Amino acid sequence: EVLKQKGYSTAIFGKWHLGSQKEFLPLQNGFDEYYGLPYSNDMWPFHPQQGEVFNFPDLPTYDGNEIIGYNTDQTRLTTDYTTRSVNFIKKNKNKPFFLYLAHNMPHVPLAVSDKFKGKSEQGLYGDVMMEIDWSVGEIFKALRELGLEDNTLVILTSDNGPWTNYGNHAGSAGGLREAKATTFDGGNPVSYTHLTLPTTER
């Protein structure tokens, strides 16, 4: 909202999870564009504990304030979010913009597009991470081609630690103790890095 007041074009593509009623959706909270899922990609009728523990309704996909479908094929999400992000950057190359790209992957259930399926030789989780790496590369490619790389702050961060009760397909905490849903180092720390620092001040 602050950036929008300063004349920035704003967009979020991906996971929102800050409320799914209309007044809580992105377009009512500072964003010009929104495409994605309103909450976690596992909150749908195909959850392995559906009926036993959960009773999730169909999972909507939003474009702006409109629901455009339910239970979207999740193998498309990373590519769809990336395509929209690149198009947003190109459309706003001559003005300030704020892009929030919040991939649903690698949150379970994992899904990967056909072009990356089996490509990592490290299983499904490896394929998913490879596609996310490709996505980051596409963002940088667009910034470079438009001459915006030196005038854009890019921050890469992640969610909590891995959900190890889903097995090794949900990631690894490496040598850190425990995982998601604990207060130990394997669950709470969030990785962060700034990949670029603008060379000009605004």
Q: Can you say where each PLM-predicted feature lies in the sequence?
A:
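Single conserved hydrophobic/aromatic residue that forms the stacking wall/gate
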Residues: H194-R202
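Formylglycine-dependent sulfatase
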Residues: E1-L195
